[in-house]
Amino acid sequence: MRWRFSIAILFVLVAFGKLCAGPQIPKRDFKLEANSKEFWALFDRDAKLGTFATGFGFTEGPVWDPEGFVFVSDEVTNKIFRVYMDGRKEELISLGDPDGNTYDRQRRLIDCASVLRAIIRLDRQGKYEILADRFEGKRFNSPNDVVTGPDGAIYFTDPTLDLPEGQKQELPYQGVYRLDPSGKLTLLTKEMSQPNGLAFSPDGKHAYVDDSDRRNILVFDFTSGHSFANGRVFGEEPGGKGDGVPDGIKVDQAGNLYVTGPKGIWVWDLAGHHLGTIVLPEQPANLAWGDADYQTLYITATTSVYKLRTKTHGFIPYLSR
């Protein structure tokens, strides 16, 4: 009982702190800024940005469900919602500081529960089980983003960005991990300052992880032994204070990267060329491919979820075999 009470108080304090800080909402107009003509192979020049839902505190972790809704984490109200096509919101669970989400291959929702310092799996009724909360006996920092890999395992980042106030960091690094279906946990890299978003290439040969602190994106070779090798800088996203940092990552079927960053979403080709930027009204944290053809980007951006139609098809790792 005392433990549950303490956790409840902690959840309230986290939410209160975020509410006091308030979401930073830049006053920007939506626009598509092209750096290359290849950018227009991905978007119509007259594309319109739609508001899918609004009225949140701070949105994260979108996941499209084929039944016609999007899972959305709200880090201020500490809830995960189903948001339907008509904008209706339905609470799945109240959970301290939910962050990035993904589906596994069985279409079960996997969440980075920052306050629990754990990776959890939720059923359709919102009941959850902890899949992992420590490595070599030491608690995770604050798991941030998660993706299903080409081998069906769960991959996630563990920065200190949302380490609960008053709690100590037990691991002496910020890592990226692999959690296989048997529950075996493997540390893939610990050389990054604040690893955040991550994604795999459609051919399964490369993994991308951005570092919010260093404002860059790294690419790793994904080996046959399910490990990361030969990490190097893929691209950089410089910006001023308050402009946003590299965060969520998604990939299309051609291998182009869509990375939230300063002022919007930066679009990169396979060679690391910055093709252009989707400038958004609010600072985005993450994004997901959705609709039946997976040609629409659903973008969690501060108080809202936006949608943008594209001319390409998203790569959905949990549907890949």
Where on the chain are the PLM-derived regions?
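Blade/loop signatures of beta-propeller domains
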Residues: 22-50, 170, 317-320
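Short, conserved, GDST-rich strand-edge loop motifs in beta-rich repeat architectures
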Residues: 25-26, 156-171, 310
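Blade-edge beta-strand/turn elements of extracellular beta-propeller
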Residues: 37-54, 86-94, 125-137, 175-194, ...
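Beta-rich, blade/repeat-based domains predominating
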Residues: 53-69, 94-118, 136-154, 170-175, ...
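Beta-propeller domains
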Residues: 69-93
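Short, solvent-exposed loop/turn segments at conserved positions within beta-propeller repeat blades
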Residues: 75-76, 114-115, 161-173, 212-215, ...
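A short loop-to-beta-strand structural motif that recurs across blades of beta-propeller domains
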Residues: 79-81, 118-120, 174-177, 216-218, ...
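Short loop/turn segments immediately following beta-strands, especially the blade-tip
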Residues: 220-227, 310-317
